[in-house]
């Protein structure tokens, strides 16, 4: 499935274009990524996030 609607991170406008027609900045996909309970890369993504934020693992 290909999502078409996009959102400008600067002015908050929604558009179908890759560049915001109002402020000219690059738009981002407005939809969150799909969730899967069997996420094969979830452990690695969480580990990287903890390392980048300097958060220790709770015991």
Swiss-Prot record:
Recorded hits in Pfam families, A to Z, give: Nop10p (PF04135)
Query: Keyword Ribonucleoprotein, does the record have it?
Result: yes
Cellular component terms per the entry's GO annotation: ribonucleoprotein complex
User: MF terms per GO, please?
Assistant: snoRNA binding
Query: Cross-referenced InterPro entries, in alphabetical order?
Result: H/ACA_rnp_Nop10, H/ACA_rnp_Nop10_sf, Nop10_arc-typ
GO annotation terms (biological process): pseudouridine synthesis; rRNA processing
Give the UniProt keywords, A-Z: Ribonucleoprotein, Ribosome biogenesis, rRNA processing
| Superkingdom of this protein's organism | Archaea
What HAMAP family does the database record attribute to this sequence? Answer: Nop10
* Family recorded in the similarity comment: Belongs to the NOP10 family.
* Protein function: Involved in ribosome biogenesis; more specifically in 18S rRNA pseudouridylation and in cleavage of pre-rRNA.
**Which NCBIfam families did the record assign?**
PRK13130.1
Q: What is this protein called?
A: Ribosome biogenesis protein Nop10
Q: What is the organism of origin for this protein? A: Thermococcus kodakarensis (strain ATCC BAA-918 / JCM 12380 / KOD1)
Classification from the root reads:
Archaea, Methanobacteriati, Methanobacteriota, Thermococci, Thermococcales
Name of the gene encoding the protein in the UniProt record: nop10
